[in-house]
Amino acid sequence: MATATLAGITVERDDEGYLKNPNDWTEEMAPELAKEMGIDTLTDEHWKVIRFMRQDFQEKGQVPTIRRMKVAGGIPVKDLYNLFPKGPAKKAAYIAGLGKPHGCI
């Protein structure tokens, strides 16, 4: 298990870089995590997805899938792919400090 310092806080990460403990995440970490995923700037639309994912995870105990983000979050799939190209669920979960969504390889 690796550790990293994000926004001045040392956190544990798994082999793929996801935070081991979602409670360690802060909003200040998100821009650093986004850069690791190739996203230079987080827009209001990115934050809408990130905040939905965190809230849904707290309520349901699972990382939301793309389908759940579309249905419960009201975020069109096309928008998800535009915001988080080549793997929106994985990238958004990573930036939100959550684990990899079920069904993602």
Predicted regions and their residues:
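A short, ordered amphipathic alpha-helix with a cationic face
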Residues: Y18-D24, Q55-Q58, I66-R67, D79-L80
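Helix-rich interaction surfaces within compact, conserved domain-sized segments
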Residues: R13, T65-I105
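General structural signal for secondary-structure boundaries
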Residues: T26, T43-E45, P76
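N-terminal first-folded block
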Residues: A4-E36
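A short, structure-level motif marking secondary-structure boundaries and short turns
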Residues: D14-E16, I50-F52, G74
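Metallocofactor- and cofactor-centric catalytic cores in central/energy metabolism, strongly enriched
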Residues: A30, K35-R54, Q58-E59, I66, ...
